[in-house]
């Protein structure tokens, strides 16, 4: 579980959005930076559509009431876990009682906080994305508590392996032609 100690400037829960309702005047909603949101979920082997926190521009403080695996992706923010700096695009293990704090955005506007398994929240019209007049809440508030999903949708297996093959760059070729000193 995660408790919101400080809701910052503007924090919401988002997923990839709701589709097929525009003819009824319902907007797609969903995360603003799709690539970063997908990346945050994929770092945890979550489905790309798992709900996650979208933190905009500055602020936010989260208390973990249970141990969890999390990831951050997107804009470069000042982020502290128990007063120690934390980087984006890594799997981070947090313990019960840990506090994750967001300062100001250094580069970009939005950072995504994903939790292994996703956040357990109500789905409206096929999406958990917060949006005014559609979801119960449109932003997270101080003292809100969110549970981790017990039944993550389409969780990816940790056993899958991705191999990355690279070609030598011109710089690598130049280095290999240099005479070796004997």
Which sequence ranges carry the predicted segments?
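A residue-level signal for beta-strand positions that form part of recognition/binding surfaces
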Residues: 1-2, 69, 145
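Transition-metal
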Residues: 1-41
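Hydrophobic alpha-helical segments and helix pairs
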Residues: 101-156
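Solvent-exposed, charged amphipathic helical/linker segments at domain boundaries
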Residues: 161-162
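Conserved small/polar residues in nucleotide/adenosyl-binding loops
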Residues: 165-172
């Amino acid at each position: 579980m995660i408790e919101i100690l400080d809701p910052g400037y503007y924090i919401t829960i988002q997923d990839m959005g709701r589709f097929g309702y525009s003819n009824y005047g319902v907007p797609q909603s969903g995360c603003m930076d799709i690539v970063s949101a997908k990346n945050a979920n994929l770092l945890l082997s979550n489905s790309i559509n798992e709900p996650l926190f979208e933190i905009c521009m500055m602020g936010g403080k989260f208390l973990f009431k249970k141990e969890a695996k999390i990831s951050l992706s997107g804009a470069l923010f000042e982020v502290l876990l128990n007063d120690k700096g934390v980087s984006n695009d890594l799997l981070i293990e947090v313990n019960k009682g840990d506090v994750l704090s967001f300062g100001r955005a250094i580069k970009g506007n939005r950072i995504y906080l994903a939790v292994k398994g996703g956040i357990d929240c109500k789905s409206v019209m096929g999406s958990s994305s917060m949006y005014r007049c559609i979801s119960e809440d449109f932003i997270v508030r101080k003292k809100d508590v969110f549970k981790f999903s017990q039944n993550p949708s389409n969780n990816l297996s940790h056993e899958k392996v991705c191999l990355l093959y690279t070609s030598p760059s011109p710089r690598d070729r130049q280095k290999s032609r240099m005479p070796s000193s004997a």
